[in-house]
Amino acid sequence: MPSIFDYKHFFDDYCKERSLDLHLSFDMPSDYETACGTFDPASKTVFINAAHLNAKPDYEKAFFLFHELRHASQYLCPEHFGSEIHRSLQYVIGYDGTCYKLVNGHYISCKLDGNEDYFTNLYLGQPHEVDANTFAYEQVKQLYGCLLYTSPS
């Protein structure tokens, strides 16, 4: 049976430490039902797909929570991040080639041709994604340490 990961505890600690007023929801928005998480800057809501992550180990649950919390900080506290991250937040590249650009507070979209591997690499290379992944990894490493690195016997 999977352990019960306390999303709310880590969420509340993160928000308190950074004076962020955010919401946490486990009801994924439309079109994000298969995602592990997302952040919506308009509603200041971190969405975590707890049902999808239920069977995953706690360190994976923590990773996705901290990843989305980092996105919240990127959007709401841009002064703490460099111009490269701030600029990259205007663009979203989906795994399927759907791309978005933030223009006057609204996203415009287009669909590019290509395979999923290509778009996955583009997605993972976006500066705000690299930063969120690095931050989440460091947080998980602090929480779980060597549990992540058991060498095969």
Model-derived features with residue positions:
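Short arginine-rich
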Residues: 138-147
